[in-house]
Amino acid sequence: LTGTLVQCNAEFLALSVLMQMACPGTPLIYSTLPTVADMRTGAYTPGAIETGILVIGCAQMAHYYKVPNGGYIGLTNSKVNDAQSGFETGMSTLAAVLSGVDMLNMGGLLDALLTFDFAKAMIDNEIALMLKRVKKGFDFSEENLALDVIAEVGPGGMYMDKPHTLERMRMAAFLPKIADRDPRQQWAEKGSCDAQAHAMKRV
């Protein structure tokens, strides 16, 4: 992996020199698509966790050079929009966002970039919105710390009816459109839909 990172950096530096020679001052993006092969078959594996690790390394190098960065991340080797697709996309994109990646190109791709799936694109959009929420992090302003409300409510109290909560409830937490959060009985009454079915309704 480390050698691949060296190669990525060498390619970025070479391209940067050529770009600046051709057109001085041209803005740069540290954009690479490093990946690994499955050593059992030689197959291209953009869904491998090592691809995510390489993107983290490239993001750190981009920070070192003070340029924006991004690339294809959140890809999967899964042929269908299933659990493998979800965990490969989720693991690598979360790692990338936490390492400071600026741009993700990930929408709707399956089967090592060979297939596009509309439902996967909708699910990837929801993942992207979740990642945006993660990147937003915490707001430690006096108002958001709500120390006065905590003191007022006291131990074991309820916050749901407090104006402070009501004013912020739609902004504080991400509200998904595809992920199901209903209790089981309501979920069953609505047709027991999985994420794929919910996504297809939104296509």
Predicted regions and their residues:
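Glycine-rich anion/phosphate-binding loop at the beta-strand->alpha-helix junction
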Residues: 1-127
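Catalytic-core signal marking the mid-to-C-terminal active-site face
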Residues: 119-203
